[in-house]
Amino acid sequence: MNVFEPRLSSWLENAGDDDDVVLSSRIRLARNLKDEQFPIYEQKEEIVDNIAEVFDDNFILIKMNQISLLQKALLVEKHLISPYMMNKSEYGAVLLNEEENVSIMLNEEDHLRIQCMTPGLRLFDALEAALQIDGYVEEKLSYAFDKEFGYLTSCVTNIGTGMRASVMVHLPGLVTTKRIKSVIEAIRSLGFVVRGIYGEGSMPASNIFQVSNQVTLGKTEAEIVEDLTQVMEQIIMQERVARTTLKQKFHIALEDRVFRSYGLLMNCRIISMKEAADAISDIRFGVELGFFEHISRQKMNELVLFSQPAFLRREAGRDMDELEEKVIRAKVIREILGDK
C-alpha cells in the first residue's frame, strides 16, 4: 500500500446512493484521552505511539515529522488529513486503512479524530463504521467523558457527541438558476453549516459545497445523521428539478457551455487550477445530463484529484513555477480525458 500513489480512494472510486448529486459522505468523531492534557498545547509523540498500538496491521501509521511537505499536501488533497494537521501538527500522525475510507488523525486539535468516508449519500454506513472503530478504541483506552456534557473536546462546539457529519455535493443546477443563495440560507436556518471542499476555512467553489451539522450537544449521533440526511434529500430533489428545467428550457445553451468546457480541457496547453475546476464542473454536469456516455463519474473524480497542485508536483518529480504547473495540469487533464 502506497498512499502517495496517484490512485482514487475507495469512496471516490465506487458508486453510491444519489451520486449524481452527492460526491461523498463523512462522519468524524473527536475524542481525547482521559489522563492527557487537551487542548494540545504541547504535542506528545508518546500519545501517537500509545494510540497506534491499539490498531492492527490493517492500518498503516504515517507520522507527520517523517514525511515531506509534498507528501503531507497529497494527504490533504485526498482528504485523509486536514490542512490544520499539515501546517500545525509537528507530532501528529494519521492511521489509514488500505481502502483509504478510514482515516484516524492523531494529535490534531484533539488526540483522536476518527473519520469514515463513503461514496454518495450513505451517512448511516459511515456512522456505523466510525462507531465500530470508536467502540474498539474505547475498550482499550479511557476517553475524557462527562455525564452531563458528553465527550470533551478541544473546541467547545464539538462537545457532546463529538461528531461532525458532512456531505459533499455538486450543485450546478441550483447555481445556474441562481437559487443557491436561498437554499444555503435555508440550510443555515436549520442549524447546518455550508463550506467549501476542504471544510472549515474553505469557501465553496466550482459548484461543490460541503454541508455539515453544527450542533453536537443534546442529540444522539443517529438523530444528527437523520436530520442531515433529510436536509440532503431535499437539496438533491431541488438540484434535480433545476437540472431538468435547464435541460428542457435551455438545452442548446447548456450543451454549448458543457461542450465548450470539454473542448477547452481536451485541447488546452496551459490552464490554471480555477479554470480547470470550473470546466471540470461543467463536464460533470454534462455527464449527469447524459451528454457524455463515454465519461464515467470515476473519471471525473480523477480529473478533480489529479489536477491538484501536490499531485502535479508529484507527476513532475520536482517543484515548479506557476507557468510550469499550468502546463503539467493541462497535460494530465488531456491524458485522463483522452483515455477511454
UniProtKB/Swiss-Prot annotation:
Per its record, what are the GO molecular function terms? ATP binding; creatine kinase activity; kinase activity; protein kinase activity
Residue sites binding ATP per the record: 24-28, 79, 113, 164-168, 195-200
Give a single Pfam family match: ATP-gua_Ptrans
Listed disulfide bonds for this chain? Answer: none
Sorted alphabetically, the keyword list is: ATP-binding, Kinase, Nucleotide-binding, Transferase
What catalytic activity is recorded? L-arginyl-[protein] + ATP = N(omega)-phospho-L-arginyl-[protein] + ADP + H(+)
Phosphagen kinase C-terminal domain ranges (all copies): 21-242
SUPFAM superfamilies documented for this protein:
Glutamine synthetase/guanido kinase
Q: Which biological process annotations from GO are given for this protein?
A: phosphocreatine biosynthetic process
What family does the Swiss-Prot or TrEMBL record give for this protein?
Belongs to the ATP:guanido phosphotransferase family.
Official protein name in the record: Protein-arginine kinase
Per the UniProt entry, what species is this protein from, by scientific name? Listeria monocytogenes serovar 1/2a (strain ATCC BAA-679 / EGD-e)
